Amino acid sequence: MNNDETIDTLNTLIETAKDGEYGFRASAQYLSSPEVKQIFARRADACLQATAELQSLVVGMGGYAEDTGSAMGTVHRGWMAVKGTLAGYSDRAILDEVERGEDSALSSYRKALEQPLTPELRSVVERQLEGVKRNHAQIRALRDQVRSEAA
């Protein structure tokens, strides 16, 4: 993999991390649970840290680091807003949509690891993937908890 391809791969992950940050922050404002709002704020901060780390790597490689999320992430957040307006912003619906976003993040990180990265970059991407997995598991557990409370 040449330098430009590696930078493209990292920039895709930057967009993914920015999507996560924006998604957690946007979703938090509609949640009813203060505890879940705090969890979302921490998740957004973790995504912001992941973004900064990836941006630093891209700049260190002589590339231009993305500083926005993806078009698909913007569409997903827009869909969440429309769906929330039509169906109401229930914690369950929000958690369902955030989990869908985390599914997408998992896919992006796994795809990046299919690329021939340097050992240093692979280590960073693997570590960040573990964070995405933790986010996903936590969101799923919260969603399941909300479902069981509603039953």
Question: Language-model features: where?
Answer:
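N-terminal/domain-start segments enriched in small and hydrophobic, helix-friendly residues
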Residues: N2-E15, H76, G88, D144-A151
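Charge-rich, acidic-biased intrinsically disordered regions
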Residues: Q38, D45, A65-V82, R122-E130, ...
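Carboxylate-rich helix-loop segments that flank metal/cofactor sites and access channels
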Residues: S56-L106
